[in-house]
Curated annotation (Swiss-Prot):
Keywords: Endonuclease, Hydrolase, Magnesium, Nuclease, Restriction system. One of its GO terms (biological process) is DNA restriction-modification system. It catalyses: Endonucleolytic cleavage of DNA to give specific double-stranded fragments with terminal 5'-phosphates. Its EC number is 3.1.21.4. This is Type II restriction enzyme MboII. It comes from the Bacteria. GO terms for molecular function: type II site-specific deoxyribonuclease activity. Its cofactor is Mg(2+).
Length: 416
């Protein structure tokens, strides 16, 4: 194994992890198209224009061939061409090719638009296929509602972004919620956080990520600078032989993470300190006087209440998990409802990873009527995760009916 940074401080586990990560051709971790340079305001502008050209969630026909192969639009694509021209003029992104091949792919995976094939059948946003029509989804309509306040828009964006990143936003929230880190730097985000619960061989749990970040913080300022400077000078494509998968590119890696990092600015659970390049979890001990997110303040009460009511102790390898993710909240009231001990469960790292990687689709709580030690997390299609007390979770079985009722109250509540 090639050592890039381990020699800067022999025995430091965080540096060893970085070198191990760089052995993988997937070292960059989570990937977003670098062409998709959008933020929440641009997203709202584009979806508003889509609503203008395809009102009332009607289907708009899009081009299915690259402009280089067929420069002209057919008559049925006129609305699409006009829409793309207006989007490009307003936001500086969204050519006809980029819109259908990049932006619409993201927006569909975020749940903000629906895509349809040539038979007008809804397609799976995470599977490849030819798309001929698009339309705003119910969530997309809600996001562009001019009567909706900005905080509620940010909450919807958070939920949508978590879907796009297959649970990554929730993982970051879990990392800062269940540890004493309180904040993370961009370098820590790129080197360690982006490896959480990914589908590559260097995947780490939130607990392992916390440990690596703390180990990294034991380095002196000079050593940390040496790590980044070394990676910048060593990870240059021309320094490597072979094809693309054999090469390493620091700037490409950093740019991809910067794109994801920037999107966190619109997530109301965090504060982005641009000057210091830090991402901070909003908690009761953060001074929010200079921010507009005071309604999203979190306290330790829900966590403390869980351990008090369930009479369990903290154990290595387990972490508190929101049964219904906080990212499901679409208003401050919903957020406060979900930030409660009755919406928490102390589960093991493996179960948390499965739940997170699924995009947190398992949020319906149920249990075995004959054995309260056996509970389940279901998704809307009936698939389930089996949870056993004193094994994959730690809880007081007598609290199970109350947790179930609390869960059902939210799930069955009518939404506007």
């Amino acid at each position: 194994m090639k050592n890039y940074v381990s020699n800067i401080n022999l025995g430091n586990s965080s540096l060893k992890f970085i070198d191990e990560r760089l052995q993988s051709e997937n070292y960059r971790g989570i990937h977003l198209s670098q062409h998709n340079r959008y933020d929440l305001p641009k997203l709202i502008d584009i979806l508003t224009l889509l609503n203008k050209h395809a009102p009332n969630q009607s289907l708009m026909q899009i081009r299915t061939t690259d402009i280089s192969k067929r420069p002209q639009n057919i008559p049925e694509e006129q609305s699409y061409a006009e829409f793309c021209n207006e989007a490009k003029s307003l936001t500086n992104i969204g050519t006809q090719d980029a819109m259908r091949k990049n932006l619409f792919v993201d927006f569909a995976r975020m749940g903000l638009i629906n895509r349809y094939n040539d038979k007008k059948v809804l397609t799976d946003p995470f599977k490849r296929g030819v798309t001929k029509y698009v339309a705003l989804s119910d969530m997309g309509v809600k996001l562009i509602d001019p009567k909706l306040d900005i905080l509620s828009k940010n909450l919807i964006f958070s939920k949508s972004l978590n879907k796009l990143l297959t649970g990554f936003v929730e993982d970051v929230l879990s990392l800062l919620t269940n540890s004493d880190l309180k904040e993370i730097s961009f370098d820590e985000f790129m080197l360690f956080v982006s490896a959480m619960n990914c589908n590559f061989n260097f995947s780490i749990s939130t607990e392992q990520c916390e440990s690596l970040i703390k180990e990294y913080r034991l380095l002196s300022r000079v050593q940390k600078n040496a790590v980044i400077d070394t990676l910048k000078s060593e990870l240059i494509p021309d320094n490597f032989n072979g094809d693309k998968k054999d090469k390493r590119d620091y700037h490409n890696w950093a740019n991809e993470n910067q794109q994801i990092w920037t999107l966190f600015e619109n997530i109301p659970f965090f504060i982005m300190e641009k000057d210091s390049r830090k991402l901070i979890l909003i908690t009761s001990d953060v001074d929010l006087s200079k921010y507009s997110k005071s309604k999203m303040k979190r306290s330790q009460q829900a966590k403390n209440d869980y351990f008090k009511h369930h009479k369990v102790n903290k154990i290595k390898g387990y972490e508190l998990d929101h049964i219904i993710p906080l990212l499901e909240a679409e208003s401050v009231d919903e957020y406060r409802y979900l930030d409660n001990w009755l919406n928490l469960l102390y589960i093991d790292g493996k179960t948390h990873a499965i739940k997170s990687q699924s995009g947190s689709k398992y949020y319906i709580f149920t249990f075995d009527d004959n054995d309260y030690n056996q509970i389940y997390f279901l998704d809307t299609q009936g698939d389930k995760l089996s949870i056993n007390n004193d094994d994959t979770a730690l809880f007081d079985k007598n609290k199970v009916p109350k947790i179930y009722e609390y869960n059902q109250n939210f799930i069955n509540a009518k939404t506007s």
